[in-house]
Amino acid sequence: MKIGILSRNKKLYSTRRLIEAAEARGHEVKVVDALRCYMNINSELPEIHYRGENLKGFDAVIPRIGASVTFYGCSVLRQFEMMGVYPVNESVAISRSRDKLRSLQLLSRKGVGMPVTGFASKPDDVKDLLEMVGGAPVVIKLLEGTQGIGVVLAETRKAAESVIEAFMGLKANIMVQEYIKEAGGADIRCFVLGDKVIAAMKRQAQEGEFRSNLHRGGSATLVRITPEERKTAVAAAKAMGLNVAGVDLLRSSRGPLVMEVNSSPGLEGIEIATGKDIAGMVIDFIEKTASSKGTATRGKG
């Protein structure tokens, strides 16, 4: 098979591992920087050009699209879909998961457990907004933040009001979520592939920090998840329409709660924590599904 990987840096761990796994199985691999692509959009023969070359003959494409280039990256991926190339994750599914509000609304519609969440732009009654989610302490998030950036724990009502007013001054849309104290600064990253959780790790925030992101110094260890957690992670990925997803769960007194569904989950932390060949499993999945062209929208979304 000829497999394309949409990535801006072939030296990144996840990209490098996918290349190694694909080549080890005899596939031809080409890494493409989506931002450097340009497209010929027409009714007869849609094309993608890259460094003067017409990209054609691909059987599958693996999108590793960074959050900052979601719009253009998904546009290029959609063009691949229109050309009949199998996407591991569809453009419309990635777009859903990158919109934090939309993704939570989709999870809500499907009845997937998640923290009580308020969404606001210019609330005229901040006190009522806080009471709506159960009062302080609360977690306040910028809608566009990633890797723990733009996430604040406000431990008192006064602090929460100050943070919300500051974010309002930036003309930013914000989410206000209940703080799950019993999680103890830890979350669980479930790596979903197809309709299965193939690996899971526990991420623990460093002392004095509540954000467990590995980019913020959190540590990762192997964890055994419950059947309910497994079911919740798969349901969350399915709600987005993702074949490959990193689903972040919190363990709460009322069961697993989904914090986020990531469409380009990193491989380094979870491969090291679990000792599993996640990259190889992704390529195996492509081998089994690409020939069926099993996409829901085929670029129509």
Swiss-Prot record:
InterPro entries: ATP-grasp (IPR011761), ATP-grasp_RimK-type (IPR013651), ATP_grasp_subdomain_1 (IPR013815), RimK (IPR023533), Rimk_N (IPR041107), Rp_bS6_RimK/Lys_biosynth_LsyX (IPR004666). PROSITE patterns: ATP_GRASP. Mg(2+) 2 binds at residues 260, 262. One of its GO terms (cellular component) is cytoplasm. It comes from the Bacteria. The keyword Ligase applies. Mg(2+) 1 binds at residues 248, 260. Residues 104-287 form the ATP-grasp domain. Its cofactor is Mg(2+); Mn(2+). One of its GO terms (biological process) is translation. Mn(2+) 1 binds at residues 248, 260. Mn(2+) 2 binds at residues 260, 262. Gene3D superfamilies: 3.40.50.20, ATP-grasp fold, A domain, ATP-grasp fold, B domain. Keywords: ATP-binding, Ligase, Magnesium, Manganese, Metal-binding, Nucleotide-binding, Protein biosynthesis. Belongs to the RimK family. This is Probable alpha-L-glutamate ligase. It comes from Pseudoalteromonas translucida (strain TAC 125).
